[in-house]
Amino acid sequence: MDIVVLGGGVVGVTSAWYLAKAGHKVTLLERRDGVALETSHANAGQISPGYAAPWAAPGIPLKAAKWLLQKHAPFTVRPTSDPFQLRWMLKMFANCTPAAYAVNKGRMVRLAEYSRDCMKLLRDELSIDYEGRQLGTLQLFRSQAQLDASKRDIEVLEEYGVPYQSLDAAGCEGAEPALARVRGKIVGGLRLPGDETGDCFRFTKAMAAEAQRLGVKFVFNCAIDEIELAQGRAVAVRAGEQRFKADAIVCALGSYATGFLRPLGLDLPVYPVKGYSLTLPMINAEASPRSTVLDETYKVAITRFDERIRVGGMAELSGYNLALNPKRHDTLAMVVGDLFPEGGDISRADFWTGLRPMTPDGTPLVGPSPIPGLWLNTGHGTLGWTMAAGSGQLLCDLISGSDTAISDEGLTLARYG
């Protein structure tokens, strides 16, 4: 089939690679002059299937209200004039029940675990360099209440057979020796030895090169105008004077999929949740993390690359605003300085922001849309890289009419009615 993929982030590029590998003729359209220059550019650097969990969790509405009053809050809201913001938040809060959380987390873990399997096969086949590490990830708890609350997540991990280690403070230092330098700040942790880390930007660039070898055509600086329908079916993409005919169109536009598809009558529940990161040069390897640690209090991840440290996190609801907020810089700097004060040079940090495409229930949209010929691969939130390989393979199998390795139940737009 002739397939057009919209979007050159990690999800779009990985989808294009799988589709080309399956024998399809693929064209990828991207408005920037290269791949992974927006949301995939400087994310937290983790592939964490075990931590695949919705932001919509029991207790979040009350926590969110408290966070609004905190200086280093992990979640903030900047009201906009767009009524979609309020509708999205109400839908998110409606998913904060224990029953909804269990269903949503189960769906996310199913896709994320499958994605890790796909990632391993992909890595073995291609041998690409993205500063990857397979040393697990460690969630850090600063209070006993946080440690006790992790039992709910452990139940889901056990249900899906995800290996884990529940650690005390000494165990955390054993997993991440540099934490011994700040002894007394951590009461325990949850380690997932199967999780991975790496640079998503480097990965996406390498995957784009591999996709080109398979014949994928990349069209950059291409501002997409509309999807053309014929008798109710998506048949082409228009971009200025160019028209790209397609048997199937994959929308992997991240947060921008919502507005782009609205003229077609599709109401995607995908909202841009703004995240921030710092990337600083590592100056002392022994004082730096070995892999990724996640500070549960501030919802900040700290990831070790070869010679750099990436600090990422925060969730800000402020629409499509890409302005850099210095307060978020200060929070990220505070967290890395608190846990790894001698690891990197914060004075030389690169400050970045991106918009994560988030659904109210946390589960992405992977599969067919109500319009024949139009397929969705968006809404992955903070887990775009974690789920990219699995989402790409699953979507490829669905488009190709092949048997799928996992069920797509609950992963499509159909769950929203």
From Swiss-Prot:
UniProt cross-references to Pfam families, sorted A to Z: DAO (PF01266)
UniProt key word Oxidoreductase: yes
Annotated signal peptide: none
Catalysed reactions, as listed in the record: a D-alpha-amino acid + A + H2O = a 2-oxocarboxylate + AH2 + NH4(+)
Pathway: Amino-acid degradation; D-alanine degradation; NH(3) and pyruvate from D-alanine: step 1/1
A biological-process GO annotation: D-alanine catabolic process
InterPro entries: DadA, FAD-dep_OxRdtase, FAD/NAD-bd_sf
Binding site for FAD: 3-17
The UniProt record lists the keyword Flavoprotein: yes
Keywords: FAD, Flavoprotein, Oxidoreductase
GO cellular component: cytoplasm; plasma membrane
EC number of the protein: 1.4.99.-
SUPFAM superfamilies: FAD-linked reductases, C-terminal domain, FAD/NAD(P)-binding domain
Cofactor(s) the protein needs: FAD
Gene Ontology terms, MF aspect: D-amino-acid dehydrogenase activity
Annotated family: Belongs to the DadA oxidoreductase family.
HAMAP family from the UniProt entry: DadA (MF_01202)
Function: Oxidative deamination of D-amino acids.
UniProt name for this protein: D-amino acid dehydrogenase
Originating organism: Aeromonas hydrophila subsp. hydrophila (strain ATCC 7966 / DSM 30187 / BCRC 13018 / CCUG 14551 / JCM 1027 / KCTC 2358 / NCIMB 9240 / NCTC 8049)
